[in-house]
Amino acid sequence: QPALSNMVRKAEKEMGAPIFDRSTIPLTVTKEGAYYIRTVEKILFLERNLERYFQDIAGLQGGTLALGGASYFCSFVYPDLIARFQTKYPQVTIDLTEGNTRELKAGLENESLDLVLETAMEKDDTSIKRYLFRKENLILAVPESFPVNRKLQPYRLSRQEILSKSFLKPEVEAVPLKEFKDVPFITMKPGNDMYKRGAKICRNSGFTMKTVMMVDQVLTSLNIVSNGVGAMFVRSDIVQWRPEDPRLVYYKLDDPLSEREITFSVKRGRYVTAAMREFMRLAGIRSDDPDTDPVAGRQKE
């Protein structure tokens, strides 16, 4: 790669210091080189923001909007928003990427993704700005065949209670979760917010979750739950996308962790384009919130 080597040596000559330590195998970046690379990245970041700004002046007459999310959001949340957006702005191309939290975070960092819809972006991550889309609630899905259900009949949730969200009313009792201490659980894989959250909810009820199987996809796991393998924590909204299944029983949870935020995430400091702003506006979000209160963008109903 002579061309690249020449570029590196030219840069080193201009800055008067080596970028790489060539006495090591493999090559390592010098202190001066690391500073040089960070500075170049900042310059390129500013150039991309400048380019996006001038592209915006032309309005929403072209360009691409890169969206990312977990499989659930790509399957059930994005389609409606994308259809509404493209009806209004058919000249803008939508690029939708499905991935796990690590992949989506990397997409924001390298700017291959403009917006990410997720529940698991860390609140204390200063590199990400988050806009609240809505909140969701977790419930417990249990195979109907499990004997533990016999004594918990009064706590069962009907499909209508879940779809109407009336189960959130204070008068609807949550199941005593400790009754499931000996029940096998199906979980998402470690690193997934649902895995960490479910484990904490069980610990808060005085027991450790007995995991018998780990999966990547919530939709896959519900099919496994319905076949009697184990119980699982799921988002209540998923019930509306499945046909009624007598093999499943659902219960309300009484734990603050059973409620979580769904947010649109943007790389902090990057230029928020007109397409990004308009997409979030169609989702009911104001995209002009101050950095001091990033998760305050949801418009009042």
PLM-predicted stretches and their roles:
Residues 12-29:
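A short LG(V/I)-centered, amphipathic sequence patch enriched
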Residues 14-15, 36-58, 279, 290-293:
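Alpha-helical linker/hinge and terminal dimerization helices associated
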Residues 63-125, 214:
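Central regulatory/effector-binding core of bacterial HTH transcription factors
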Residues 71, 130-144, 153-163, 180, ...:
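Short Pro/Gly-enriched coil loops immediately N-terminal to beta-strands
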Residues 77, 144, 236-239, 244-292:
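A late-sequence structural motif
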Residues 100-104, 109-112, 119, 187-247:
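Hydrophobic hinge/microswitch elements
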Residues 142, 148-205, 272-276, 280, ...:
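Secondary-structure junction motif
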